[in-house]
Swiss-Prot record:
GO biological process: mitochondrial transport; negative regulation of transcription by RNA polymerase II; response to hormone; response to vitamin D; sensory perception of sound; thyroid hormone metabolic process; thyroid hormone transport
Protein encoded by which gene: Crym
Native organism: Rattus norvegicus
Keywords of the record: Cytoplasm, NAD, NADP, Oxidoreductase
Protein known as: Ketimine reductase mu-crystallin
InterPro entries recorded: NAD(P)-bd_dom_sf, ODC_Mu_crystall, ODC_N
EC number(s) per entry: 1.5.1.25, 1.5.1.1
High-level lineage: Eukaryota, Metazoa, Chordata, Craniata, Vertebrata
Length: 313
C-alpha cells in the first residue's frame, strides 16, 4: 500500500532549516550546475505565471529536476497585491517533493520559510563573490520577511561594522531594528540609507525605481531581490547600465525582470558562472545581482528539509 505523503508545516520546515547558512554549499553547487546547461543535469523551465486579474494576484508554478541531488520538486506560489494582513499574507507558497524514480508524491511542505531562506542564501553567495574588499556598511531597503532572512544570514556570514535600514513605513523599519539582534540604524530616506554603503539589499514591493545610481558608492554591490515582474522596478536606468550585471538565470531575467527589460541593461553573467569560475567576479566595480529566484533553489532546500525530517523519524 502506497504511503500517504508527509505534510511539513512552516514550524517543521523551520526546525529542519534553522540556519540559512546550511544552504550555501549545496546552493553554490546547484547554481554552477544550472549555468552549465544540459551538462549540469538541472532541468528547469522559466516559471509559469497565471494572472488572476480580477483579484490583483497571480499563481506561479516552478518545477525542477536535479540529477546531482536526484530530486524532483515543484513550488506553487501566489502573490496578491495589496492583500497583506495577519490572516492572509500577500505571498504564499507550498513545495511538493516527488520520488524521481516513480513520480509518487513524498511530501508537501510550507514554502514560505524555504523561499525566504534560500533567497537570502543566494544573495549571500553573490555578495561573497562580488562585494568590494573591506566592506563595512550594509544597507537593507525594505522591512518584510526577506529583510529578516537577509539580515540573519548576512550577519552570520559577514562582519559589517554598520547596518542601515529604510522602509517606506518607518514604523516597520523601527520594529525591524528593535526585533533583530545587533544594532540597526533606521534612516529617513533611501538616499540617507545608501550613501556610502558597500553592500545594498533591495527587498521592497516597489514597482518604480527607488534606488538611483547617483546615490550609490562606486564599487558597491547591490542585491536586487524585489520587482519580480516585467513591469516592476527597484533600480533606475543609470544604476542598471553603469553596473556589471549578474543574474541567477539569463532566460528568466529576459522574461521576468523589469529592472533588466525596462533599462535595456546588458547581462554580463549568471551567478553560477561566477561560482564555477567560468566568468569573473568584478568586485572592484559597481555590481548588481538581480535575483528572481529559481526552482532549483527550492529543490535544494526542500531536499535538505526532507532528508533531515526523514532521518529523525
Amino acid at each position: 500500500m502506497r504511503r500517504a505523503p508527509a505534510f511539513l508545516s512552516a514550524d517543521e520546515v523551520q526546525d529542519h532549516l534553522r540556519s540559512s547558512s546550511l544552504l550555501i554549499p549545496p546552493l553554490e553547487a546547484a547554481l554552477a550546475n544550472f549555468s552549465k546547461g544540459p551538462d549540469g543535469g538541472v532541468m528547469q523551465p522559466v516559471r509559469t505565471v497565471v494572472p488572476v486579474a480580477k483579484h490583483r494576484g497571480f499563481l506561479g508554478v516552478m518545477p525542477a529536476y536535479s540529477a546531482a541531488e536526484d530530486a524532483l520538486t515543484t513550488k506553487l506560489v501566489t502573490f496578491y497585491e495589496g492583500h497583506s494582513n495577519n490572516a492572509v499574507p500577500s505571498h504564499q507558497a507550498s513545495v511538493l517533493l516527488f520520488d524521481p524514480s516513480n513520480g509518487s508524491l513524498l511530501a508537501v511542505m510550507d514554502g514560505n520559510v524555504i523561499t525566504a531562506k534560500r533567497t537570502a542564501a543566494v544573495s549571500a553567495i553573490a555578495t561573497k563573490f562580488l562585494k568590494p574588499p573591506g566592506s563595512d556598511v550594509l544597507c537593507i531597503l525594505g522591512a518584510g520577511v526577506q529583510a529578516y532572512s537577509h539580515y540573519e544570514i548576512f550577519t552570520e556570514q559577514f562582519s559589517f561594522k554598520e547596518v542601515r535600514m529604510w522602509n517606506r513605513t518607518r514604523e516597520n523599519a523601527e520594529k525591524f531594528a528593535s526585533s533583530v539582534q545587533g544594532d540597526v540604524r533606521v534612516c529617513s530616506s533611501v538616499q540617507e540609507a545608501v550613501t556610502g554603503a558597500d553592500v545594498i539589499i533591495t527587498v521592497t514591493m516597489a514597482t518604480e525605481p527607488i534606488l538611483f545610481g547617483e546615490w550609490v558608492k562606486p564599487g558597491a554591490h547591490i542585491n536586487a531581490v524585489g520587482a519580480s515582474r516585467p513591469d516592476w522596478r527597484e533600480l533606475d536606468d543609470e544604476l542598471m547600465k553603469q553596473a556589471v550585471l549578474y543574474v541567477d538565470s539569463r532566460e528568466a531575467a529576459l522574461k521576468e525582470s523589469g529592472d533588466v527589460l525596462l533599462s535595456g541593461a546588458d547581462i554580463f553573467a549568471e551567478l553560477g558562472e561566477v561560482v564555477s569560475g567560468a566568468k569573473p567576479a568584478y568586485c572592484e566595480k559597481t555590481t548588481v545581482f538581480k535575483s528572481l529566484g529559481m526552482a532549483v533553489e527550492d529543490l535544494v532546500a526542500a531536499k535538505l528539509v526532507y532528508d533531515s525530517w526523514s532521518s529523525g523519524k
